[in-house]
From Swiss-Prot:
Gene3D superfamilies: Aconitase, domain 4. InterPro entries: 3-IsopropMal_deHydase_ssu (IPR004431), Aconitase/3IPM_dehydase_swvl (IPR015928), AconitaseA/IPMdHydase_ssu_swvl (IPR000573), IPMI_Swivel (IPR033940), LeuD (IPR050075). Heterodimer of LeuC and LeuD. This is 3-isopropylmalate dehydratase small subunit. SUPFAM superfamilies: LeuD/IlvD-like. GO terms for biological process: L-leucine biosynthetic process. Pathway: Amino-acid biosynthesis; L-leucine biosynthesis; L-leucine from 3-methyl-2-oxobutanoate: step 2/4. NCBIfam families: leuD, PRK01641.1. The gene is leuD. Its EC number is 4.2.1.33. Keywords: Amino-acid biosynthesis, Branched-chain amino acid biosynthesis, Leucine biosynthesis, Lyase. GO terms for molecular function: 3-isopropylmalate dehydratase activity. HAMAP family: LeuD_type1. Pfam families: Aconitase_C.
Length: 201
């Protein structure tokens, strides 16, 4: 998993509450277990018309936001089913950080496991960031996980809280496998000692 220390990029505004995982990645895209290629299906029902043509009015289709790295979204983001394809689709599109006032628990934890930083802020701060994100290509925001600060286009900063263990994993690029490998020396030492003390096992 790629490390997350500091991210600077365009923030896209999505002021919609209760965006569920079905909206993030529709069921038609769930037939694969690959993590790549799902970016085309991200918000597909909003990004494309029924005939498959691009909906130019959807925020991520607008030229200023096509390479957005940060999503500023409404309350209760990621609710609904627990499909892990949702963070996969966000990541494959290029989104590495989602900022909202709240997240569904399963989606929130899945983000950390896949290298996406979900940040919870107050309603007041979300409104400030949403205003910043309306600036199009000038909506450049920096998210610093080391200092736990979000810096807007005008230089103003917002602090955010995050679980220390999750922060450690993101800063060091550790998913579940990486966490296990981090303890590989201790595991090897235990196995050696265990084999010596219990040769019959």
């Amino acid at each position: 998993m790629e490390k997350f220390t500091k991210l600077t990029g365009v923030a896209a505004p999505l002021p919609v509450v209760n965006i569920d995982t079905d909206m993030i990645i529709p069921k038609d895209y769930l037939k694969t277990i690959k993590r790549t290629g799902l970016g085309t299906g991200l918000f597909a029902e909003a990004r494309y018309h029924q005939d498959g043509s691009i909906n130019q009015d959807f925020v991520l289709n607008k030229p200023a936001y096509q390479n957005a790295k940060i999503l500023v979204a409404g309350d209760n983001f990621g609710c609904g089913s627990s499909r892990e394809h949702a963070p996969w689709a966000l990541l494959d599109f290029g989104i590495r950080c989602v900022i909202s006032t709240s997240f569904a628990d399963i989606f929130y934890n899945n983000c950390f496991k896949n290298g996406i930083l979900p940040i919870v802020v107050s309603q007041e701060n979300l409104e400030k960031l949403m205003d910043d994100a309306q600036r199009g290509s000038n909506a450049v925001v920096t998210v610093d996980l080391e200092t736990q600060e979000i810096t807007g286009p005008d230089g103003g900063s917002i602090s955010f809280e995050i679980d220390e263990f999750k922060r450690h994993c993101m800063l060091n690029g550790l998913d579940d496998i990486g966490l296990t490998m981090e303890k590989s020396s201790a595991i090897a030492s235990f196995e050696t000692a265990n084999a010596a003390s219990r040769p019959w096992a």
